[in-house]
């Protein structure tokens, strides 16, 4: 019988993590299960930096971005000593289960943890990259793409006013799903993602066509693109297309913040 579980948020933060924390705690408490939260992911597990989570401690957080448990990437956890310290913490608190909210790296950590303990472990997919199997949408993805769409719509306004081409970089080191979906929603004229190689040549071949039609364009690039992201591509286009006014915009960490969307809150609550 499960009496007590542990909970962490790990890796890069994503909007909706707080909604998921709330759902875990409220569901557990409804079954009279205690929840111990550890701060800063696996780092907090190693250091036993914990808090006893109650329904009152997770009230009014469903709408907030970030994570009340903080998050981090832990190099110590990848060492035998670090893993043993984490296992010792789990045993000290007599946990019957352990919940990890995070991305692929966090799940690999959970997999490693299960090799050293028989505690039942559950992973909730929390990453803006949407690159985990088993779910159509990870926690954070919907909010991130909505943030991108809002930003690119504004960039489109100024691009149109000045007849400029904007190369916009979005997050996605190994996965181009943020770039792909937001490009469709924004009506971007071109997209470059890690999953498709050699698309830059196709883009360069559009020079004649683009010169004869409208002058303002949006090119969305995933940061993991093989050509060096927006900076690499933008600088190359400036050399290849000197007649165009080309600007570079990197959206950065705004994609990981902000209030989660309605869809995000519902998905995170149901997971």
What would you call each of these model-derived segments?
Residues 13-24, 46, 80-81, 98-111, ...:
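Short glycine/serine/threonine-rich phosphate/pyrophosphate-binding segments
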Residues 238-271:
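C-terminal non-catalytic interaction/assembly regions of soluble proteins
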Residues 1-46:
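N-terminal phosphate-binding or glycine-rich loops at protein starts, especially the Walker A/P-loop
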Residues 45-100, 105-106, 139-150:
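Glycine-rich oxoanion-binding loops at beta->alpha junctions
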Residues 100-102, 108, 112, 117, ...:
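Accessory alpha-helical/coil subdomains and C-terminal extensions
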Residues 22-31, 51-57, 112-122, 139-143, ...:
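A glycine- and small-aliphatic-rich helix-loop capping segment at beta-alpha/alpha-beta transitions
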Residues 10-13, 38-44, 73-74, 103-105, ...:
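Short, ordered loop/turn segments at secondary-structure junctions
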């Amino acid at each position: 019988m499960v009496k007590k579980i542990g909970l962490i948020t790990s890796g890069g933060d994503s909007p909706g993590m707080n909604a998921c924390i709330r759902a875990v705690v409220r569901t557990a408490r409804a079954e009279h299960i205690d929840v111990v939260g550890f701060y800063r992911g696996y780092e907090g597990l190693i250091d036993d930096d914990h808090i006893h989570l109650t329904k009152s401690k997770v009230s009014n957080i469903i709408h907030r971005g970030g994570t009340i448990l903080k998050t981090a990437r832990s190099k110590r956890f990848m060492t035998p000593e670090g893993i043993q310290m984490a296992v010792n913490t789990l045993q000290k608190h007599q946990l019957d289960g352990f919940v990890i909210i995070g991305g692929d790296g966090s799940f690999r950590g959970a997999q490693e943890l299960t090799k050293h303990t028989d505690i039942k472990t559950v992973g909730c997919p929390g990453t803006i990259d949407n690159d985990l199997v088993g779910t159509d949408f990870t926690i954070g993805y919907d909010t991130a793409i909505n943030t991108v769409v809002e930003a690119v719509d504004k960039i489109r306004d100024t691009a149109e006013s000045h007849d400029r081409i904007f190369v916009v970089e979005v997050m996605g080191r190994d996965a181009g799903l943020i770039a792909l979906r937001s490009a469709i929603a924004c009506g971007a004229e071109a997209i470059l993602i890690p999953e498709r190689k050699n698309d830059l040549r196709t883009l360069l071949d559009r020079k004649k066509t683009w010169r004869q039609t409208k002058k303002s364009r949006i090119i969305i690039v995933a940061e993991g693109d093989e050509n060096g992201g927006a900076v690499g591509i933008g600088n190359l286009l400036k050399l290849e297309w000197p007649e165009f006014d080309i600007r570079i915009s990197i959206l950065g960490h705004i994609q990981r913040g902000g209030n989660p969307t309605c869809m995000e809150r519902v998905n995170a609550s149901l997971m």
